[in-house]
């Protein structure tokens, strides 16, 4: 649909970048936005950079002050738990 806007913030591997480039270049879709790519970091010669109907951003999904604080507090609690002989929360490979 030529008015469609495609957004990918999942994984770069779920999109065929060559097909997305063609769809954008030939106006099969109106616009796209992504923060993930087939190859990361994205090479400077990626043809998507030539297009003006795509917004590309670096993949920074959790880079907020709140996230940094939560990760720091969680990590500190895990260390405290282990030092006190307790199993850490969310231990996935026990």
Briefly describe each language-model feature range.
Residues 3-94:
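Rossmann-like dinucleotide-binding domain for NAD(H)/NADP(H)
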